[in-house]
Amino acid sequence: MPLSAAIKSSLSVSVRADAKGLVGFANTGYNGITVLKQTYWTSFYMKGEYSGTVLLRLTGTDSGTVYGSRNLSVKSTGGKWTQYETTFEANESYVAENEWQLLFDAATAKGHPLHFGLVQLFPPTYKNRTNGLRNDIARPIADLKPKFLRFPGGNNIQADRPGDWHYPNTDALGLDEYLWWCEDMDMVPVLSVWDGKSYGGIVSGEELQPYLDDIKDELEVTLPLTLLSHPLRAYLTPNTNEQYLLGPPSTPFGALRARNGHPDPWPIQYIEIGNEDDYSGGCDTYPDRLVQIYDTIHASYPNLTLIANNMDENCLPEIPLPGLWHDYHYYRSADDLVAMFNYWDNHDRGDRVLVGEYGCRNDSNPDGVFWSFMQGSCAEAVHMIGLERNSDVVMMAAYAPLLQHFGYTQWSVCTPSASLAYLGIHPADRGEEQPTLFGFESRPNSLTLSTSYYVNRMFSTNQGSTVHKVHSTAGFGPLYWVATSNETAYQVKLANYGAANQTVNIRVPGVGRGVLEMISGPKDASNLPGDIKIVPVSRNIRAGKEGYTVHMPPWGVAVLVVVFK
């Protein structure tokens, strides 16, 4: 039985004639549910004849321990759906094996089925957003001070077939929620649109026209029902001739956006067209599809920046499209990623590039590695230094994968990376048996910040706006560096990709005091769940006669910040 035009299925519960006491159903989450000492919000829609009490609770699956509960009085009828919501306090469970239960009186429910839809349970969310992000997971992301969010990202936009990837996704994370995420973390949104290619086939030519209309609808006419997770999506109809994303609140869809909590138009400036056509058999038709979509968007929004999903000349139009950026994805072993240090040095300075996905992969093992390790994190630092030195070309860069639930993994990349020109995040993809930037599971206190997380945080929270020429008595390797400044400080970033100690003297004009932050560890060392040993250490440092003397241990990464204002 559909709950709405957008939610076409629901749970039907029939009670056996011999049932007694409390009956109902449970949701066991993703390998359990994290239960902490905090307030939980829960909601569900109900339809069917039932007047009485519903018991909502969080319990141990094996132990039966009740950590929190609420009795809720309901009066449901068979003629309509009714939403019920409540909150309750919970005590902490120290195990992952927990479940949410909804129970009702068997005697009262006998003889007619009860229907339930859009069942939800939320802990406190980041900035208290409705349908928002988990606080414990969102905060480490916010601590990175990321600059943009590419969404829905990767194979979630490319899909196994039109509209769907092949493993479970948090589909309640919709267009509004992505944009609130951007607003709450002060990130620039990079909106991906489907370009007609999925792993189940390609739609091109005249057959692409309905999807061109859909892109226009998303931007200026009708928000696609599948992209809006707010309950009001049930009332949206096609061909509403007003604007949701970009329209003023005086229009019907602008008014809807305002009712959803955002009176001002969403600040859409960047749109990427598809995902990885060069890697997955799309090149024969991508040039034509790209032109079709480019022309459709550019005609109405000439000031938007449009991004092709690859840099392959054989996968792009023969005649370059004005103002088009290019996206480049690559994963490498640690040594190969370091070898790409100067990859962008001789690139066309007129080009503009988004490195939408990259990371260090240990390809000596066909399955990659399970955990971020210090050599790989140092390799990423070297590569980030190379990207920052070329930030006139590489405008944005994002590592992938960002995070994962340890029990729900799909592919292996040893560690994530990020650009220092603009640090971005790629939320959709996941690694195999490894924490990527960081990982978690349903057991409390399982959040595991990797060595790469700390390297990325060191770099992303110490960004400059100007890259400076450095006069050096040595060449790059095994020590790599870049010097930048902003309106208040100089930043010097260093990485020692080698097994020997290195000492470097750094002269910074005019100031004699700074702060040095450093992370280092054995080549193969990793942070593991419950065993986080490798973290950055900060200390004050004074300049001597030779400047700031920095001793770089093997596989060490450091950032020197010298404030002049």
Curated annotation (Swiss-Prot):
GO cellular component, one term: extracellular region
Reaction(s) this enzyme catalyzes, per UniProt: Hydrolysis of terminal non-reducing alpha-L-arabinofuranoside residues in alpha-L-arabinosides
Name of the protein this chain belongs to: Probable alpha-L-arabinofuranosidase A
Protein family per UniProt: Belongs to the glycosyl hydrolase 51 family.
Positions in coiled-coil regions: none
Keyword flag Glycoprotein: yes
Compartments where located: Secreted
Residues in the signal sequence: 1-19
Annotated glycan sites: N71, N91, N128, N303, N362, N486, N501
